[in-house]
Every structure is written in structure tokens, then in C-alpha cells.
Curated annotation (Swiss-Prot):
This is Cobalamin biosynthesis protein CobD. GO terms for cellular component: plasma membrane. GO terms for molecular function: ABC-type vitamin B12 transporter activity; threonine-phosphate decarboxylase activity. It holds the Pfam family CobD_Cbib. Keywords: Cell membrane, Cobalamin biosynthesis, Membrane, Transmembrane, Transmembrane helix. It is a multi-pass membrane protein. GO terms for biological process: cobalamin biosynthetic process. Belongs to the CobD/CbiB family. NCBIfam families: cobal_cbiB. The gene is cobD. It is found in: Cell membrane. Converts cobyric acid to cobinamide by the addition of aminopropanol on the F carboxylic group.
Length: 323
């Protein structure tokens, strides 16, 4: 169960797509977040060099998450093979966020459809890092589509990639890196030095998945009534139009497929950040564009599921042959 296993991966996908992250079930990311907070406080007290402290924070968090996952899967499998299978599948499913991404983004979309911009701003603030208090309706739709596009990589394709290659241990290690980046990977006075290692590692572990996401979006676009030609054209043209080395890849493919323009100026913590535009404004950014983005997210997920299951089956076969 610790090795890549297509059965575990298939069950994890079904659990995520059907249930998402039930609010009553303790989530590993919450526990990882608490560990990060504890380690950050400890390292700041014990170490003067924040860059070295940042490396230790990364190493300790990822090692802890991977080790606990390994022990849980190994221990449950020792009790019974079925228990090992279910624990591995459950832990793997917590690395995926397709259903949660749709659910949380849909709350914003529903508020906008109801004409409640104030509520939409508040709900959007829960899932994006930018300031939302002064956003107008189109800016809210833009931010919403951008976060769904970017999180298609972070929350779905990248976890599937690592689960297929390394099973639940690799999947949880990736989740630890992603959580670190979301908590300490900021270029501000507090985290510029402490968070640099986590931010760079997040760039690294998402490097291939981000480009794979863009490729899959281009491939599946015509299957759901979107433009493949424009998706490919904009992805090639605008894939580097972002401070992050990865974010613009899925955003550019999505913008091209939908025929919309993303990017541009945004405010973070009261500071204006002027980003390059991604895509061309061939159509308005509205609820229809958002729903197209959700279709694109799910189509991309299904395409990656096929690739991941095939990869896990191949690696499983190689492992069994070597025994």
C-alpha cells in the first residue's frame, strides 16, 4: 500500500470526487499547519540565521508528514490488508481538492449570481490571497477563475502526479510543501528569509505538473466545447507572464480556452501588484466563463486520472516483478 497502487489511487479519486473534504473529518493539512506554526515559533527562538531555519522548517515538516503517513499505512496494513488499503486511499484522497475547489468557488459564484457582491467579496477572500474588499463584479469573476485555474495544478494535477509516482507518502510530502508555501512562502519582511526554501521547493515540485496541466487543458478543451487552437496559442505566448515560474502555465491555457483575459493589477495587503495580462479579451468574464472553467478543471482531472492510474499500474507491476 505504501508503493504506488492503482487501486488506492482510484479509491482516492472516487472519495475526493464524491465526498471532497468532509468538515467533520480531521484533515492532515490542518495538522501540518499546526506543526508548521509550532516549528516556526521554535526555530525563530533557537536560531538567528533565518535562511538556515527555513531549510530546517522545510526538512522537518516534510519528513514528519511523510513519516507519519508511512507509519499509518504500514501499521494498518499489518493489522489487515483491507485496513491498509482503506487508510492509504483515505490519506491519498486528502491530498486532492477537486470537489473542495468546486464547492468553495461555487459559493462565490452563487453570491454573484444572486447580486450579492458584498458576500461574494467575503467568500472570495477565503480562497485567494489578494485584497477583495474593493473588487467589482468582473474583478471577482477574474480572481475566481484565476484561482480555480492555478489550483487545478496545486490541488489536483500535482497531487495526482506525486501519488502516481510515490504513493500516499509522496502525496503527503507534496501536501506538506504546498502548505508550507501557503503559510510562509511570502516575499515580505517576516517571511522573505524564513520562507525562501519552502517557496523554492514548491516551485520545484510543481514545475512538471504545472506544464502538464496546461498541456492537458489544451488537449481536453475541444471535448467540452472550448477552443483548443486558442488555448494552445495563448499558452505558448503567455505561459511566462507571471512572477511565479508555474502559475501562468495553467492560467494561460485556461484563458485561451475560455477566450478571456486574466492577470493585470491586483492588491495584496494594501500594496498594488501590477502583473502582466494573460490571454485576450475575446469575451466577457462572467458566470458563463466560470462554469466553463469548472468544466475544464474536471475534464483535465479526468485526463490526468487516466495517466496517473496507468503510471501507478506500471510502477506497481515493476515493483511486483522485482520481488
Amino acid at each position: 500500500m505504501i508503493q504506488p497502487d492503482p487501486t488506492v489511487l482510484a479509491l482516492a479519486l472516487l472519495l475526493d470526487l464524491c465526498l471532497g473534504d468532509p468538515r467533520w473529518l480531521p484533515h492532515p493539512v490542518v495538522m501540518i499547519g499546526r506543526l508548521i506554526t509550532f516549528l516556526e515559533t521554535l526555530l525563530r527562538r533557537c536560531m538567528a540565521n533565518e535562511r538556515i531555519a527555513g531549510v530546517l522548517l522545510l526538512a522537518l515538516t516534510v519528513t514528519s508528514a511523510a513519516s507519519v503517513t508511512w507509519l499509518m499505512v504500514w501499521g494498518s496494513a499489518r493489522l489487515h490488508a483491507l485496513a491498509g488499503l482503506m487508510v492509504a486511499a483515505l490519506l491519498s484522497s486528502t491530498c486532492l481538492a477537486a470537489r473542495s475547489l468546486q464547492r468553495e468557488s461555487c459559493l462565490v459564484a452563487d453570491a454573484l449570481d444572486a447580486g450579492d457582491i458584498a458576500s461574494a467579496r467575503v467568500k472570495l477572500s477565503y480562497i485567494v490571497g489578494r485584497d477583495t474588499v474593493d473588487l467589482d463584479e468582473e474583478e471577482i469573476w477574474r480572481a475566481l477563475i484565476e484561482t480555480v485555474a492555478e489550483n487545478t495544478t496545486d490541488g489536483i494535477i500535482a497531487p495526482l502526479f506525486w501519488l502516481a509516482l510515490g504513493g500516499p507518502v509522496a502525496g503527503m510530502a507534496f501536501k506538506a510543501v504546498s502548505t508550507l508555501d501557503s503559510m510562509v512562502g511570502y516575499k515580505n519582511e517576516r517571511y522573505l528569509r524564513l520562507g525562501w526554501a519552502s517557496a523554492r521547493m514548491d516551485d520545484l515540485v510543481n514545475y512538471i505538473p504545472a506544464r502538464l496541466t496546461a498541456l492537458l487543458m489544451v488537449m481536453v478543451a475541444p471535448l467540452i466545447g472550448l477552443s483548443q487552437a486558442n488555448a494552445a496559442s495563448i499558452a505558448l505566448r503567455d505561459r511566462l507572464n507571471h512572477p511565479s515560474p508555474n502559475s501562468a502555465h495553467p492560467e494561460s491555457a485556461a484563458a485561451g480556452a475560455l477566450g478571456i483575459r486574466l492577470g493585470g493589477p491586483s492588491t495584496y495587503g494594501g500594496l498594488l501588484s501590477v502583473k502582466q495580462f494573460i490571454g485576450d479579451p475575446l469575451r466577457s468574464i462572467d458566470g458563463q466563463a466560470y462554469r466553463g472553467m469548472i468544466r475544464l478543471m474536471y475534464a483535465t482531472t479526468l485526463a490526468m486520472a487516466v495517466i496517473s492510474l496507468a503510471t501507478a499500474a506500471l510502477l506497481r507491476g515493476i515493483h511486483v516483478t522485482q520481488l
